[in-house]
Amino acid sequence: VSVVLGIDTAGPVVGAALVGPGLERVWSERVVRGADAVLIPAIAELLEGAPQLDAVAVTIGPGAFTSLRVGVATALGFAMSHGVDVVCISSLEARASMVSGQRVLALLDARKSRVYAQTFDTLTGSTLSEAVDAALETVLPMSPFVAVGEGVKLGETLIADAGGTVAVDPGRSPALAVAKLGLQRRTDAVPPSAVALAYLRDADAQKLAERR
């Protein structure tokens, strides 16, 4: 029986969720800058009166460089203060796991008309393609498929023309999915010191792209 805190800051909507037996608390907010200013107090409120925390799950990338760092730093801070380990989750898998389907395309905006993309079979929990940083038209899977994640907004017409459907609001935070994946993967938890971000793009190039 475990209580897991999930955190996602890979996109413009940052979120956190707490799950456990008979427990499900979720918070999210669209943030332009300074995610830590709203994220940390929101998590403190989620944890108020909750049972003891057993693990923290956090998305480690790909995604917005600065925002990802805030999320991971926050996760490490809470993990260390509670003396628990961290479950590292792909930000693309977290978004895909919000829907059920044989072909689920998870998309995040990578700036400069590109997306971070990966296709999953969420019915079997398998990965159908590698995570890539590419133009949207090059990553569309065979029809039919479901598209999810903030990157959907870059090409809803393109997705529809390729036989894809959009299952959930592209701006919806996957924080609850992150917490649930963390619960399933408690045995994969690592000490805070072993957590590393997973960029698909060179960090300096990514920071430059985000400034444009």
Residue ranges and their predicted role:
Residues V1-F65:
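N-terminal beta-alpha supersecondary unit
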Residues G22-G34, V38, V84-P174, D188-A189, ...:
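Surface "functional belts" at beta-alpha junctions
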Residues D36-I40, A75, A175-A179:
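A general structural signal for well-ordered alpha-helical segments in protein cores
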Residues A44, L76, A94:
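Active-site phosphate/pyrophosphate- and oxyanion-stabilizing loops and adjacent acidic/basic residues
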Residues L47, A179-V190:
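Short, hydrophobic alpha-helical segments
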Residues E48-L53, A79-I89:
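Phosphate-handling active-site elements
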Residues V58-V86:
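DPxDG-like acidic metal-binding loop motif
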Residues G63, F78, A147, A179, ...:
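A residue-level signal for conserved active-site and pocket-lining positions in enzyme catalytic cores
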